[in-house]
Amino acid sequence: MNAKDEGEHLPLLEEYMDDLRGVDAVVVTHAHLDHVGALPYLVRVLGRRRRVPVLCTAPTRDLMPIMWRDYLRHTRFRVYSSGDVIRALRRVRPVNYFESVRIRGVRVTLIPAGHLLGSAQVLIEADGRRIVYTGDVNFRGSLSLAPAERVDADVVIVESTYGNRRHESLEEAVARFGDVVKSVVGEGGVVLVPVFAVGRGQEIFTALHLVRRELGEVPLFVDGMVRECTRVYYRYLDLLTRECREALEDPWISDEIFHGRVFSRETIARATGVVISTSGMLLGPALEFFRLIAGDPRNAVVIVSYQAPSTPGYLVSQGRNLLELESGVVRVRCRVEVISGFSGHSDYSDILRYLGEVSPEVCILVHGDEDAIYAMKERAESVLREARIEVPGVGEGLEL
């Protein structure tokens, strides 16, 4: 599901009921809402006929209900109920990384994807052939997770989120982030970091830990779902990098996660420090904070996540200094920094390197805006000269 909850951004399952009748299992790559937002609805639709298992990693199982319940609290258009959430969870079968599950002669294996805690690529093997769906994937690695495993396959279904962009290095991203925090807080301002509750939030905690020595004592405020989702990370410390584990064990961060005091947003906006709030596209609580700090040049908003076109985060990142929102007009006088190095997605150079190593017979490009996906297609054609490269439309079937 999209960050918006209307029209074409909603799932179109009812239009594809004939295709859904043959579904034997649902495999989930990770717990971000654009990948699992409609799963309770899908389970309800499939349940009219039979019980279909949902395969995912244990961390994904633990994170999904947090995302669903938040959706139910804030959406204006419900496609499922809290009862559907409970029924969907009953269908979940946790699968370990590299553990294979057989479904009617097909072997399914989940492979680390490096995108966020519990994220997985899906390897499907049948009749001597291998298909891999990367899901959202990070071949470079991040502050919190090791790089994605590179899986050989005859058919690769790969994301194209950054098919037309390259990221700065992690080292550069951390250094720039530290410089922004140090300068803004040093002048008595507030640094707002809008994050996705799962993935980017924990990256920023790790970045803060890495630059803490330079910052000194800086007040830290955590809002939105970040606290609840980060608590899940503590259950799976063995899946995290050493740097991320050390960050989560830092009392400066862990005290805020487990024992953070409750302040009004107005109080925090008048203080100085770092505010980490959902959502990453400057929606929800983060937008409320932004309304309060945007008019003061001493403050800063640091954009560290993908921004869907037309979202407030996208408009601000493109230099818009006047936002017309349902709740009123916001004049943007604060500092705006865009840091791409914290991304949980591979950029085109990493994906091209992977495709060149694997050299699949078929490459299917998905999960990208039109400009990004066709830029990725053009680049992939230069690397996979003998391969069939497809960009399917919504609802379009492909014969392999």
Model-derived regions: residue spans:
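His/Asp/Glu-rich metal-coordinating catalytic cores
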Residues: 1-27, 32-36, 40-215, 219-221
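Short, solvent-exposed amphipathic alpha-helical segments in soluble enzyme
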Residues: 125-127, 148-150, 207-213, 237-238, ...
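A general structural motif
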Residues: 137, 169-173, 251-264, 279-282, ...
